């Protein structure tokens, strides 16, 4: 519900 600074995966679950 926020997601991704530089290179995360599929974090916004």
Curated annotation (Swiss-Prot):
Occurrences of domain C-type lectin (ranges): 11-13
Keyword S-adenosyl-L-methionine: no
GO cellular component, one term: extracellular region
Compartment(s): Secreted
GO molecular-function term, one example from the UniProt record: toxin activity
Sequence similarity: Belongs to the snaclec family.
The name this protein goes by in its record: Snaclec convulxin subunit beta homolog
Species per Swiss-Prot/TrEMBL record: Crotalus atrox (Western diamondback rattlesnake)
């Amino acid at each position: 519900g926020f997601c991704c600074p530089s290179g995360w995966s599929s974090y916004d679950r």
